[in-house]
Amino acid sequence: MRLWISVCLCLAGVAGWFGAATSWLPGPPSVTEAISQDAPAPGATPAKVTANNPDNGVTISGHSQENRFVSVPRFFRSGDIPKFAQAVVNGTPLLTQCDVKNRWPDGSLKFAVISFIVPKVASHGTEVRFQNQASGNNEGYLDKSAMLDAAYDFDGTISLAGTASHVISARSMLQAGHFRYWLRGPVVTAVIIEDRDGRSEEVNTDGGTGNPLHPIFEAWFYPASHKVEIGFTVENSWASSTPAKGARNQDFELTLSTGKAAPAVRLKQAKFTQLIFTRWRRAFWIGSDPPPIRMNWNPRYLLQTGAYPNWDIDGLPNASALAAENATNTRLNPARFTIPGYDDIYASKGKGLGGIGKYDQALNAGGQADWIGPANTWDIMYLLTGDPAMEQMMVTNADLGGRFPMWYREADHKAGSGHYFDHPNFGSIDTYGRVVSINARQQVTLNLGNWRPGCAGEERDAINLTGPARVSGWGASQDTSHAPDFAYIPYTLTGKYYYLEQLQMDAAWSVGAYVGCFSPNPEPESYYRQGSMGVIPNISRQAAWAIRTMAYAAFVSPDGEPEGPYFADKVRNNVAMLEGEHGVALSIKDNAERNAAYNYGKVEQYTQSSNPSPLGAWRADDCSGPTPWSQVGCYATPANNMTPSAFGAEATFMEGFILVTLGLVNQLGIADATPLLQFTAKRYFHVLSDPAVNHYSIEQYVYPTRTAAGWVKDWDTYQKLYGRLPGGWRGFESREDTDNAYSLIAMTAVSYMSRLSVDGYSGQQVWQWFYTNRPHLRACSTYSPKFCIKPLATR
């Protein structure tokens, strides 16, 4: 059965927002040329389907229609498309606009938004493949006057009614020249309408000093049909050392309208408070919506690009899994699907838990959650199946997730003690308008619950507010221990700029939220971020999800912009610190800071550098803070199936989380985490392959790490520290059992060790045995595919 995927561009009333520009200046004026389906330009390479170059295309379906515009965000394998992608339908090359955002190190196409006109969309599906062409066809885009042509009826207004009231017009901002290009060419012109430099379009609704509300519109113009999709955003995200230049809570009623000749009200929101450091997005088509189309993303190829975890296509979610995922939405309070969400973190009002979309206010609550993992469950399901309900869920949650107060935009030039975005004191890139950089604000802590932790000299890096931060239940989860990845899949499956910035802001918060103090001579058991170093010596899950999101942002931030290198730098520092912590050789030696991070790993609070675990235990105890070896750790309890002789135990899920993240870091090419995976592979390979070890124990909640005498040193002692050894595999009986299942987390971790060998055990054979003998595919299909991940053969 074919799997169809909706293109987000065609969602009625929910799609919108485009992308971050690689240039702050509008491109030169250009008159739109007629679109024709000509032969390929010289240099085009015919698409071929071979064993080494599998079908790289998509399949578009929906209502039968002709000359349908389509924009497809797409990753390609390294080397598959040397220059630019061209769409081919039934052997006929189409005029194709290819807006390149990223290239592989060999120069071949990595990620682009590919736009073209499909001659005919068949209800049963029209296959589109991609081949190489010499040009991206990025001329012939709309200039300002063309976008203002009456045929587009272009306008979008944001009406804010408060103590002070305002109407902000996208058309007026465009006329004033406050825009920059995101996509350019004859098929689609996408612009970001914003005055980031001058802040001339900003307002307040409290009548106070300074204007914290920052409007952004994003418009995608399709000349062939004169259709425009417009996204609306209001940010309250400015971060400044001068309170009047920064964010402060604002109360207002909201109305969004589209069109110029006869404006249509698309959204009305009763009075609410837009909190500090929040943002939101809503998007609509001007006039009537185009007929919907659906697309098969071809996950078999897409996953081979290495851009995503290699989810198992033999365990794709079935109708039951999709229905169950969607059913969770219908049980939620409808107020959670509004811009302000529903504020009741403890469900004291009798209308269910507070939250925004599917995200609970209490993100850090214990137990399984759809947002814990390499990606949100619903995002994964959309990528793998294209189910329209999952698409709607992805867009809605990505649009509304900005309700949590964690989205910061730098308001100061040469901010903080470090002054520069790219390097403290000796950089070259100004901080203004970008995400908050800890290279500049070296000791800032982006945690409203720990706003001034007391670092020596932190005031030089401070973000100052007009008063106490009042964010009610939305500020309850200000660390990354249960943090979602809000925007990586939404950005890469829509190409929308809002989601790109959401990803970058999320990544910046992920490293900035940890205690920012710097100590020039760190003492044993230190736990600071070490200022601009950006390391996170804390419980494994807190580090795991911060590194995950930073790695995604490093991988997909547009080439030529500083955000990608910035996040890659922080990921590499964390890998170096963890190598120092575990006493393995430093693998990243590109600058002196890696040595500093490595040496810090030798003294931070979880270090085992001078006395590493003989059996490859990731941590002696993964508790909040170090546990003296003379004391029993937090996980070594009879309730967790440990005997009284066990003084320490590691949580298998926490260890699995960090190992899965390190595997992703390897796969994405951000850093070489192989030495760390090699260190921990010893336990996994022995438990799963050594005939003297109980294989089923791999899925226990915790495993023993130490006794009163020190580390567990042999497998006989290891097994005797369990209260009872399991006699078989656990069953998967629900979504909750499967979504964060310990055995599937372990299987995913082992998938990233498949090329290793330890004590004569082959990683590929260990993984194959685990995959074959531990029943799981039915659960992946029926419940959740989140941790159903296989080794990636090649990229």
What are these regions (language model features)?
Residues 31, 35-165, 178-181, 186-197, ...:
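Alpha-mannosidase-like glycoside hydrolase catalytic domains involved in N-glycan trimming
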Residues 2, 6-8, 96, 621, ...:
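Secreted/extracellular small peptides and ectodomain modules produced from precursors
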Residues 17-38:
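Signal peptide processing junction and immediate N-terminal pro/mature segment
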Residues 7, 78-80, 147-149, 223, ...:
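Sterically constrained small-residue positions within well-ordered secondary structures
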Residues 184-795:
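Catalytic cores of extracellular degradative/oxidative enzymes
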Residues 166-172:
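Glycine- and charge-enriched low-complexity intrinsically disordered segments
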Residues 1-23:
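Sec-dependent N-terminal signal peptides
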Residues 68, 147, 151-158, 170, ...:
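Generic structural signal of hydrophobic/aromatic residues within well-ordered alpha-helices
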